[in-house]
């Protein structure tokens, strides 16, 4: 069997990883061994936080809806229940956006939902 020299491939792989570590402080951007560890941790954190971001935004929307709902004399859970009973299909993202940007429209939605429950 012929001898395989891997110098070119190793250099290419190291260069690619050091490119990913660009902007890191100190040895993390210059030394392969340290940079490799930093990049692996960064990729793991990014993967985890892409999933966490979805949860965080949902929590934020719920907090905003709850705060706006309490201004209209109801709570988040009662509002969501009345929206479902009134067959008003609006997601939490849109509801939170209305609560922040257009309080009058949010108030009308709350009134419609409460009217459907009492009727």
Curated annotation (Swiss-Prot):
GO cellular component entries: ribonucleoprotein complex; ribosome
Annotated source species: Chloroflexus aurantiacus (strain ATCC 29364 / DSM 637 / Y-400-fl)
Protein name: Large ribosomal subunit protein bL20
PANTHER family in alphabetical order: 39S RIBOSOMAL PROTEIN L20 (PTHR10986)
One example GO MF annotation: structural constituent of ribosome
Keyword line: Ribonucleoprotein, Ribosomal protein, RNA-binding, rRNA-binding
UniProt cross-references to Gene3D superfamilies, sorted A to Z: 6.10.160.10, Ribosomal protein L20 (1.10.1900.20)
Keyword RNA-binding included in the entry's annotation: yes
Name of the encoding gene: rplT
NCBIfam families (alphabetical): rplT_bact (TIGR01032)
InterPro entries the record matches: Ribosomal_bL20, RIBOSOMAL_L20_CS, Ribosomal_protein_bL20_C
PROSITE patterns from the UniProt entry: RIBOSOMAL_L20 (PS00937)
GO biological process: ribosomal large subunit assembly; translation
Lineage: Bacteria, Bacillati, Chloroflexota, Chloroflexia, Chloroflexales
Function: Binds directly to 23S ribosomal RNA and is necessary for the in vitro assembly process of the 50S ribosomal subunit. It is not involved in the protein synthesizing functions of that subunit.
Annotated family: Belongs to the bacterial ribosomal protein bL20 family.
């Amino acid at each position: 069997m012929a001898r395989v020299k891997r110098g070119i491939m190793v250099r290419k792989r190291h260069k690619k990883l050091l490119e990913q570590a660009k902007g890191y402080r100190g040895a993390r951007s210059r030394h392969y061994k340290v940079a490799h560890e930093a990049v692996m941790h960064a990729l793991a954190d990014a993967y985890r936080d892409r999933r966490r971001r979805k949860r965080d935004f949902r929590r934020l929307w719920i907090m905003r809806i709850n705060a706006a709902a309490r201004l209209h004399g109801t709570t988040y859970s009662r509002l969501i229940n009345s929206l479902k009973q009134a067959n008003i299909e609006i997601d939490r993202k849109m509801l939170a956006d209305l609560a922040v940007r257009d309080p009058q429209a949010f108030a009308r939605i709350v009134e419609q939902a409460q009217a459907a429950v009492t009727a």
